[in-house]
């Protein structure tokens, strides 16, 4: 059993179906049905007609790709220096005993507090003692005029 292909749509044509058109120059075209034949004669581009095989191939429709295993990238540990501290310093601090680190930390805190106190004391000495507040001035009383007598009748 010979199965042909439609010249326009690309679908299979089984025996007993389809129509063959032969042009004057000898080229023969086999169409699945009248719809394909008319579309060809109207010079439609099968790549732009959504139901044709060529369109589906061009726009990658219905292609089931092999689901290859996705590789997950493992995070790699990497040690490097940080701004203000070299790698050697960081490693030295890490390898110190906790008691020594605690003592060092307490010492640093103590020094920082001392500096803070010194700055505060210097600021206090530099700023002159605030002058005594004088009694607030009393505002002058507003002079209000008497309302003019109403002239006129009852209404």
Curated annotation (Swiss-Prot):
Keyword presence, Electron transport: no
Signal peptide (residue range): none
Sequence ranges of Low complexity compositional bias: 124-133
Species whose genome carries this gene: Drosophila melanogaster (Fruit fly)
Gene from which this protein is expressed: RpL24
The keyword Ribonucleoprotein is annotated on this UniProt entry: yes
Protein name, as recorded: Large ribosomal subunit protein eL24
Region span, Disordered: 119-155
Domain of life: Eukaryota
One GO BP: cytoplasmic translation
């Amino acid at each position: 059993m010979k199965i042909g292909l439609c010249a326009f749509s690309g679908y299979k044509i089984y025996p007993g179906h389809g129509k063959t058109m032969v042009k004057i120059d000898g080229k023969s075209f086999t169409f699945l049905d009248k719809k394909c034949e008319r579309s060809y004669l109207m010079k439609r581009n099968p790549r732009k007609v959504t139901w044709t095989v060529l369109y589906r191939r061009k726009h990658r429709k219905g292609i089931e790709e092999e689901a290859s295993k996705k590789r997950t990238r493992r995070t790699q540990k990497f040690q490097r220096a940080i701004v203000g501290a070299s790698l050697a310093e960081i490693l030295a601090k890490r390898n110190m005993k906790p008691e020594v680190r605690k003592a060092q930390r307490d010492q640093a805190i103590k020094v920082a507090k001392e500096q803070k106190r010194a700055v505060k004391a210097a600021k206090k000495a530099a700023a002159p003692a605030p002058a005594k507040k004088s009694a607030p001035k009393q505002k002058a009383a507003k002079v209000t005029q008497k309302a003019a007598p109403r002239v006129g009748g009852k209404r």
